[in-house]
Amino acid sequence: MKIIQVENQVEGGKVALELLKEKLAQGAKTLGLATGSSPEEFYKQIVESDLDFSEMTSVNLDEYVGLQEEDPQSYRYFMNQHLFNQKPFKASFLPNGAAKDLEAEVARYNQLLTEHPADLQILGIGTNGHIGFNEPGTSFDSQTHLVDLTPSTIQSNARFFDKMEDVPTQAISMGIGNILNAKSIILFAYGSAKAKAIAGTVEGEVTEELPGSALQKHPDVVIIADKEALSLLKH
């Protein structure tokens, strides 16, 4: 596991862009993408670059259940706004959270990940160490699955919705097994709220109680983080 300390998210995005260029030069064809504030600056750097993704494929970590893709809170909408509209890929795959048959959609997406394993997977990490929507207790072997969101996740998402009953209670997420299948992984972490999760991910016991610790089992992980997120590391 390699750790790169950066001043802020802007520098983190620039560092990640250089790593992406290296992977593309080595023939990377499929990118695993994430949503949320952590990779936003990275996508901004990509959009401002001269990189061309018209022959590339992308696969996303997760999507909320019950939201149409044009819903501003859906992850498809987020990806369109921050990356796909400006830098189209040959194919961009996300789980379909509006699917009528969710079990069939989970199976379809898992098969798709088998056909398009990520050459480079982008990750953020939750304060409790979750990666994707894989909460503590998720098996390291897990494949794409339907997740019941924790009360704390539902509560923290409530600010984005007019009514509490509109807040999604489930998501479709890549499993930890799918994530570990990627050839290379970049994880972004910023702020002191992430310090405990990063300490456990890098130096803690490898345990399913801290999903991020699964990354210790992977041969090519780069963590891009600021001083605050790295503040609890012992070494």
Curated annotation (Swiss-Prot):
Keywords: Carbohydrate metabolism, Hydrolase. The active site is at 62 (proton acceptor), 128 (for ring-opening step), 130 (proton acceptor), 135 (for ring-opening step). It catalyses: alpha-D-glucosamine 6-phosphate + H2O = beta-D-fructose 6-phosphate + NH4(+). Pfam families: Glucosamine_iso. InterPro entries: Glc/Gal-6P_isomerase, Glucosamine6P_isomerase, NagB/RpiA_transferase-like. GO terms for cellular component: cytoplasm. Its EC number is 3.5.99.6. Pathway: Amino-sugar metabolism; N-acetylneuraminate degradation; D-fructose 6-phosphate from N-acetylneuraminate: step 5/5. One of its GO terms (molecular function) is identical protein binding. GO terms for biological process: carbohydrate metabolic process; glucosamine catabolic process; N-acetylglucosamine catabolic process; N-acetylneuraminate catabolic process. Coiled coil: none annotated. NCBIfam families: nagB. PANTHER family: GLUCOSAMINE-6-PHOSPHATE ISOMERASE. Belongs to the glucosamine/galactosamine-6-phosphate isomerase family. NagB subfamily. Catalyzes the reversible isomerization-deamination of glucosamine 6-phosphate (GlcN6P) to form fructose 6-phosphate (Fru6P) and ammonium ion. This is Glucosamine-6-phosphate deaminase. It comes from Streptococcus sanguinis (strain SK36). The gene is nagB.
